[in-house]
C-alpha cells in the first residue's frame, strides 16, 4: 500500500528533464479515512480541485508554451495524488513537444486518472478570484483562544434550542485556518467554508474548532473530511458542504470539497484572494 513515507515529499530530488509519468505518487485514501471512522460507503460526494500555475511545454517548432490548468480528482477515487510528485510530474513536460495543446491536456488527464484510480477531468485555465455573496466571516468574532490542537470537536454545537426555533441556511467562512504537512511539518494555510441547512451552528464554537487544527499534522484532503465528519456528527445539519482553499505551494494549490449533496456542488466557483 502506498504511503507518504515512500514518496518524494520531504526529500531533495532533482527536477526532471524528460517527461516521466512514474513521478506521480498515489496515497491510499482509506488509511486516513479509517482514522476518522469513514468506511467503504462514503458519507459525502465531492472532489479535490487542483489549480496549476506553472505548466509549460514545447510546440512543434520548439517554442515554449505556457498555461494554467485545473484538475478535478473525484473524492471517491481510491487514491489521492501527493502534491510534490504532481509538481515534479508537471515540470517534466518542460522539454516535451506537443503539436496541439489538446494533446497535452489528454495526456495529463490519462496520467492523473491512472494515478488516482478514477477519471480525472483536466481543463486549461483557472477560476476567477472572488468570494460568495452571502458568506458570514467568523474572523470578526471577538474571542479568546488558548487551544491550538489537536482538533477538538467538543467545540461544535448548535445554538441552544430555547434561543432558536427554525432551521437556517448559512455559509460560514474563516481565513484563519492552519494545519501542517504530516511529512515535512510545513504549515498549510487555508480559507475554510462551511455551508449547511439545519439548526443554527454556534459561530464561536466553529471558529474555535477551526483554530484547534493549528498544530495538527494531516493532509489537506483528510483535514476537510475530518471537519465534515465532526460537523455532521456534532451539529446534525440536514445538508452540509465543507471546502478548504489552500494557499499555493510549488506552483499548485488544492481545494478539497465534501458535501452531502451534489446540489451544493461546487460550493464556490472562485479562487481565494490568497491563491
Curated annotation (Swiss-Prot):
Subcellular location: Cytoplasm
Enzyme type, top EC level: oxidoreductase
Annotated positions binding substrate: 81-83, 220-221
Broad class of where this protein is predominantly found: cytoplasm
Statement: the UniProt record of this protein carries the keyword Oxidoreductase: yes
Family: Belongs to the GTP cyclohydrolase I family. QueF type 2 subfamily.
Entries under HAMAP family matching the protein: QueF_type2
Function in brief: Catalyzes the NADPH-dependent reduction of 7-cyano-7-deazaguanine (preQ0) to 7-aminomethyl-7-deazaguanine (preQ1).
Protein name, as recorded: NADPH-dependent 7-cyano-7-deazaguanine reductase
Amino acid at each position: 500500500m502506498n504511503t507518504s513515507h515512500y514518496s518524494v515529499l520531504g526529500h531533495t530530488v532533482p527536477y526532471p528533464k524528460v517527461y516521466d509519468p512514474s513521478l506521480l505518487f498515489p496515497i491510499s485514501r482509506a488509511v486516513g479515512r479509517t482514522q476518522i471512522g469513514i468506511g467503504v460507503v462514503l458519507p459525502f460526494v465531492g472532489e479535490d480541485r487542483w489549480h496549476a500555475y506553472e505548466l509549460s511545454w514545447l510546440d512543434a517548432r520548439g517554442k515554449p508554451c505556457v498555461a494554467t490548468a485545473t484538475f478535478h480528482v473525484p473524492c471517491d477515487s481510491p487514491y489521492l495524488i501527493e502534491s510534490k510528485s504532481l509538481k515534479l510530474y508537471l515540470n517534466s513536460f518542460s522539454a516535451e513537444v506537443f503539436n496541439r495543446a489538446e494533446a497535452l491536456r489528454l495526456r495529463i488527464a490519462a496520467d492523473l486518472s491512472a494515478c488516482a484510480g478514477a477519471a480525472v477531468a483536466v481543463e486549461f485555465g483557472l477560476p476567477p478570484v472572488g468570494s460568495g455573496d452571502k458568506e458570514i466571516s467568523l474572523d470578526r468574532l471577538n474571542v479568546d483562544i488558548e487551544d491550538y490542537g489537536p482538533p477538538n470537536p467538543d467545540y461544535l454545537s448548535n445554538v441552544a434550542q430555547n434561543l432558536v426555533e427554525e432551521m437556517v441556511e448559512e455559509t460560514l467562512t474563516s481565513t484563519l485556518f492552519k494545519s501542517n504537512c504530516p511529512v515535512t511539518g510545513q504549515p498549510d494555510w487555508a480559507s475554510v467554508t462551511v455551508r449547511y441547512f439545519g439548526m443554527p451552528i454556534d459561530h464561536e464554537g466553529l471558529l474555535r474548532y477551526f483554530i484547534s487544527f493549528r498544530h495538527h499534522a494531516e493532509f489537506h484532503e483528510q483535514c476537510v473530511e475530518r471537519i465534515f465528519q465532526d460537523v455532521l456528527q456534532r451539529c446534525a445539519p440536514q445538508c452540509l458542504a465543507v471546502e478548504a482553499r489552500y494557499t499555493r505551494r510549488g506552483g499548485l494549490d488544492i481545494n478539497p470539497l465534501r458535501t452531502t449533496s451534489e446540489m451544493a456542488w461546487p460550493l464556490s466557483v472562485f479562487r481565494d484572494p490568497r491563491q
